[in-house]
């Protein structure tokens, strides 16, 4: 392996297991160069405002990646759940399979619930059911009958605060 081209094979692995992110250094450089060269073309097609937004995002990614690499190189970030490793893809003696670690899950215990007889039934409160009086159907002027009475204008329905259900029924009847 040529020592001068050794940095071209770097891969940055973020996390461990099948959900880890692998950042290929040459691909990252090609992406940065491509977005830099596409700037003038995008400026003609899209406009200055969106190109400025893309430029800001590009510089944020570049600065963030530099800070990230410096942090990894100084081994500042050594958490158990967040593992980062930089390795060359052509290193001898290492296999390319990703070994998965068991996920840490919280232990849960199920508690049997007591059966409540009132739940699922509709016996929370009694609804008084009254029989409707027989009404004479309204006959329209053209001779056809209608079940609904014509509106007589604003009706005055006696409402009481004590029995809301009866108020609802009375309002529905007089509507």
Swiss-Prot record:
It is found in: Membrane. Its main location: membrane. It comes from the Eukaryota. Present with 1200 molecules/cell in log phase SD medium. GO terms for cellular component: membrane. It is a multi-pass membrane protein. It comes from Saccharomyces cerevisiae (strain ATCC 204508 / S288c) (Baker's yeast). Keywords: Membrane, Transmembrane, Transmembrane helix. This is Uncharacterized protein YOR097C. The chain crosses the membrane at residues 21-41, 50-70.
């Amino acid at each position: 392996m040529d020592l001068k081209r050794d940095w071209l094979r770097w891969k940055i692995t973020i996390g461990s297991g099948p959900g880890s992110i692998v950042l290929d250094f040459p691909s990252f450089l090609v992406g940065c160069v491509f977005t830099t060269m596409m700037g003038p073309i995008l400026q003609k097609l899209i406009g200055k405002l969106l190109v400025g937004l893309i430029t800001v995002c590009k510089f944020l990614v570049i600065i963030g990646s530099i800070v990230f690499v410096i942090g990894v190189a100084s081994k500042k970030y050594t958490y158990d759940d967040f593992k980062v490793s930089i390795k060359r893809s052509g290193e001898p003696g290492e296999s390319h399979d990703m070994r998965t670690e068991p996920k840490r899950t919280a232990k849960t215990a199920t508690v049997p619930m007591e059966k409540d007889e009132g739940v699922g039934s509709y016996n929370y409160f009694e609804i008084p059911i009254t029989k409707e009086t027989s009404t004479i159907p309204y006959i329209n002027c053209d001779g056809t009958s209608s079940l609904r009475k014509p509106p007589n204008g604003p009706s005055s329905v006696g409402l009481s605060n004590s029995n809301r259900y009866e108020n609802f029924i009375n309002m529905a009847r007089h509507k």
